From Swiss-Prot:
Function of the protein: Involved in calcium binding and microtubule stabilization.
Cited Pfam families: TCTP (PF00838)
Protein name: Translationally-controlled tumor protein homolog
Primary site of residence: cytoplasm
Keywords, alphabetical: Calcium, Cytoplasm
């Protein structure tokens, strides 16, 4: 399995269990998810040697809660955050500087294409700004990547957008 992490914070953003496609401009990964519902916090009696009594048929799931949402968000503990258009512009300026600095260290040949492509990508994001929900990594570090959540034309299928140059991949 390959885990994709934020280069700035090293927060886990997504993995290769999802359908991943590179955007036509080569700047981002689109990661397709699903809406899921899962019970968290339940303890399986079989794991602790318990045996449910036939006399007591109550539905006690041990303080468990039901969580529903996009699987990418839930599985990788992404945290929702909010932006106005102006606050996103300020954030993205700082984020681009951080990614550029990382690229200068790790992949200098990628700096020029990144700086050219990111301008058009940001214009595209700002043009569709009202469609997006914004997510940071688990630590909610304000310097880290903010992933974008949108839905396909069917209005049902969620997908997330991650800046390709802001990610490192780690094989597990």
């Amino acid at each position: 399995m390959i885990i994709y992490k934020d280069t700035v914070t090293e927060d886990e953003m997504f993995s290769d269990i999802y359908k991943i496609a590179e955007t036509p401009d080569g700047m981002c990964f689109e990661v397709e998810g699903k809406i899921i519902q899962r019970v968290e916090g339940a303890i399986d009696d079989a794991l602790i040697g318990g045996n449910a009594s036939a006399e007591c048929q109550e539905e006690d799931i041990g303080g468990a809660t039901t969580v529903s949402g996009v699987d990418i968000v839930i599985n990788h503990k992404l945290q929702e955050t909010g932006f106005t258009k102006d606050s996103y512009k300020n954030y993205i300026k700082d984020y681009v500087k951080l990614v550029k600095a990382k690229l200068e260290e790790t992949d200098p040949d990628r700096v020029k294409p990144f700086m050219k492509g990111i301008q058009d990508r940001v214009k595209l994001i700002l043009g569709n700004f009202k469609n997006y929900q914004f997510y940071t990594g688990e630590r909610m570090n304000p310097d880290g990547m903010v992933a974008l959540l949108d839905y396909r034309e069917d209005g049902v299928t969620p997908f997330m957008i991650f800046f390709k140059d802001g990610l490192i991949s780690e094989k597990c």
